[in-house]
């Protein structure tokens, strides 16, 4: 199993990136308001990332540099296709994301986790710092 982290920076990469996010984060949750043209995707300091397993796109995440001087990165819009969930793909994605973030000077990652994803992040060493009922804020030092 070879999981690769790719920047979503070509036409095929963007198509796969948006298809995975639309399906996992919107369609499966009964939402229809996905916007693939949202300007945050192209802001300086935002890194839309695509993960492929043996050449097949299986997951996405975006790393936003919240405060580059303080070394803080925000993990956003994490999505793994359902058929690849609970197979170690999400954990491997987070490991590769941490390595990538470290190359950008990130020392701490934050994420507003879906309530049902909190145990996943806790297993990976994240800690809740704001237990909001909708999306708890979690953090993990990486540097």
Predicted segment positions?
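Conserved beta-strand in the GNAT
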Residues: 50, 56-65, 72-79
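Short amphipathic alpha-helix that is part of the acyltransferase structural core
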Residues: 1-43, 50-56
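Conserved active-site tyrosine of GNAT-family acetyltransferases
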Residues: 21, 121, 126
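A conserved beta-turn-beta hairpin within the catalytic core of GNAT-like acetyltransferases
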Residues: 65-76, 85, 131-135
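Conserved acetyl-CoA-binding loop-helix of GNAT-fold acetyltransferases
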Residues: 80, 86-99
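Conserved GNAT acetyl-CoA-binding A-motif
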Residues: 94, 101-114
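C-terminal "cap" of GNAT-fold acetyltransferases
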Residues: 107, 114-116, 124-143
């Amino acid at each position: 199993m070879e999981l690769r982290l790719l920047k979503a920076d070509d036409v095929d990469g963007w198509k796969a990136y948006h298809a995975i996010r639309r399906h996992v984060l919107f369609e499966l949750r009964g939402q229809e308001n996905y916007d693939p043209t949202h300007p945050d995707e192209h802001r300086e300091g935002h890194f839309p990332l695509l993960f492929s397993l043996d050449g097949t796109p299986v997951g996405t995440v975006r790393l936003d540099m919240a405060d580059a001087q303080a070394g803080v990165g925000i993990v956003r819009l994490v999505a793994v296709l359902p058929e690849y969930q609970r197979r170690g793909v999400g954990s491997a994605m987070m490991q590769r994301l941490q390595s990538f973030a470290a190359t950008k000077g990130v020392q701490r990652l934050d994420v507003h986790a879906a309530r049902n994803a909190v145990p996943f992040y806790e297993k990976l060493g994240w800690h809740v710092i704001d237990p909001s009922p909708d999306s708890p804020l979690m953090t993990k030092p990486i540097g």
